[in-house]
């Protein structure tokens, strides 16, 4: 088995609306069991730590809590073989452009 993989990010990585929901994840996270971090972990044999969260911004990755969850970077412990960061859309306010 490959090593530890930590996925950080917003809804672009969490995969809200893609069923099934990731077991044990907070409902508000919108985390799918079929999001790309889960697919990478499954195909490559990684032990996945998925802390992606819908609505997250760069601040939620680095310093701020989000819906009572700690900053996502706290999931890193130095043993990771792979870390992905998928964030930025919420920082630039992309949602209004989707509904315009």
Residue ranges and their predicted role:
Residues 22-100:
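Conserved SGNH/GDSL esterase-like catalytic core that processes O-acyl groups on lipids
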Residues 3-27, 92:
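Catalytic nucleophile-elbow at a beta strand-turn-alpha helix junction centered on a G-D-S/GDSL motif
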Residues 1-2, 78:
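Proline/glycine-enriched tight loop/beta-turn segments at coil->beta junctions
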């Amino acid at each position: 088995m490959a090593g530890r993989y930590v996925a950080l990010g917003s809804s672009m990585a969490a995969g809200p609306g893609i069923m099934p929901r990731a077991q044990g994840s907070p409902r508000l996270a919108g985390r799918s069991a079929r999001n790309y971090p889960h697919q990478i972990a499954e195909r490559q044999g990684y032990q996945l730590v998925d802390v992606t969260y819908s609505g997250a911004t760069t601040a939620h990755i680095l310093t701020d809590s989000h819906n009572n969850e700690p900053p996502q970077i706290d999931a890193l412990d130095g043993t990771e073989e792979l870390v992905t960061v998928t964030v930025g859309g919420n920082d630039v306010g992309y949602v209004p452009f989707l509904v315009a």
